Design a protein with these regions (language model features):
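Short amphipathic alpha-helical segments and helix-helix/interface helices
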Residues: 1-4, 42, 75-76
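Active-site neighborhoods of divalent-metal-dependent phosphate/nucleic-acid chemistry enzymes
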Residues: 50-92
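Helix-adjacent hinge/juxtasegments
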Residues: 26-53
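A general alpha-helix detector
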Residues: 23-27, 61
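Acidic, PIN/NYN-like endoribonuclease modules and their adjacent C-terminal/linker elements
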Residues: 81-120
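Short, conserved alpha-helical segments within structured domains
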Residues: 16-20, 58
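Short, well-structured N-terminal submotif of metal-dependent ribonuclease cores
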Residues: 1-16, 30-36, 97, 109-120
Length: 120
């Protein structure tokens, strides 16, 4: 929730992939069971986050990645291509071979707070 607040308050920019939107939609639909509410919540995500596409080149380059999970490797390639600063995930272990910066939500919030203190 704190990361959503940081994005809402424009302390950082949140980016999701189009694939992430379909995953979120699926999870919300399974837990809420109300199509209108799910669509309302997903629309809110569109107001908070930028949504980026994954290109075929992201998928191709991911095949050469040391990250064995293809979905995670594609995420790294997409993040790198769009110029993201980092990936925030609860699954740090899945990205241990990544040369791209990856943080847990807690680590990201700590980093964000440190950067705010430097700017003040």
């Amino acid at each position: 929730m704190e990361i959503l607040l940081a994005i809402s308050n424009r302390k950082c920019t949140g980016v999701l992939t189009a694939k992430s939107i379909t995953d979120i939609y699926y999870i919300l639909r399974r837990s809420i069971h109300n199509e209108e509410e799910v669509r309302r919540l997903v629309r809110i995500l569109f107001t908070l986050f930028e949504v980026e596409d994954t290109f075929s080149t992201d998928c191709e380059f991911a095949l050469d990645s040391p990250i064995k999970d293809c979905e995670n490797a594609i995420m790294v390639q997409t993040a790198s291509r769009i110029g993201a600063d980092c990936i925030v995930t609860r699954s740090l272990k899945d990205y241990k071979l990544s040369s791209f910066p990856v943080f847990s939500p807690e680590q990201f919030l700590t980093k964000l707070a440190e950067e705010e203190n430097i700017e003040e």
